[in-house]
Amino acid sequence: MANVTFTEAASTDINHRADITFAYFTQRADGSTAAGSGPNAINAYAYYPPSSKSGSDNAFAGTVWFNKNFATHKAPVSGDFSSQTFTHELGHALGLAHPGSYDASLGNPSYQNDAAYYQDSLQYSIMSYFNAGYTGADTKGVYGYGPMVDDIAAIQKLYGANMNTRTGDTVYGFNSNTGRDFLTATADNGKPVNFAVWDAGGNDTLDFSGYSQQQMINLNDGAFSSVGGGTQNVAIARGAIIENAIGGSGRDVIIGNDQDNLLAGNAGSDILYGGLGADHLWGGKDANNFTDYFVYLNAKESTVAAFDVIEDFEHGIDKIDLSGLRFNNSLSELRFIDSGSAFSGQKGEIQLNFDAFNGTTDLLMNTQSNSYAADFKIHVVGQVEQSDILFA
């Protein structure tokens, strides 16, 4: 995610001191605090990197220390406290501070008394001391798998964004091809994932198809998704572009971004917002005939030049929701006109052109006054009739 390269150095090479060193302790190196395993024991600590290459300003600069008496430090697992601790302390060694001017050595800081701003929580930064619940997240006790959105922004400010990170077509979540366990979901076991994505290119996907809970997936950068039973537990870093999203078997809400998205709701009654761009939308068919909703908030979201394709519409079951155009495009009503007839120049005219041979429908609409051509279009695989359209 940043222009930092880690190369392991032999611990016996005293002539070429590593920039960052890791070690266990039973007493702090400066002798100030004894280690232990009780409630007041120091769990881990680290020193900031040296201000000069020689590191002569601090003999401990760039060193990271873990309490040997904490058994979980010897075998950390993604999502547990020790894994979070390792990432937190490494953040210090790279130059990251706590979001506020607090520290365990200064007492027992609290969100109410010491948070410098609202987002100072583990939802936004693994460098925070404060539970993600303070900012509305619920990770079911799962700690961040790695750096979170604010950590990514901070480390990129210090070292620059790495534009070679996963430039191919990358899948995050289920069916992941990242080769990273902290960006992968493997089971619907009641423990949701908790990670932030940085991606530098390609055509990429958030895949949460293995979950059965109700989910909300948001592809906008800087936004959080609620997946696998968690709340706001997956984020996309600022500046990262993820094009596609796949939901699970529950009732999912999927929100696209300004790219050409592929959104798939899968089973369950799903709500899909394609947003801008020429999107391909699958509600997902299943034996229970659940209703899928394809929602449009503005006529710019599916134009004649760059129109959406709804790939699996079921007449009498699914709905196309155009009510957002009432407010954002000042349309007071829809006026259906016959297939193939000319637009009269009155905005709000809508036409459904069904191709029986191919089994497709083109939904065309004029949203401009004194215009005699459609400016809004959706191509639908399936038959669409007036009763399938919502405009409340």
What role is predicted for each listed range?
Residues 17, 201, 210-212, 221, ...:
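Extracellular, beta-strand-rich repeat scaffolds characterized by small/acidic residue-biased motifs
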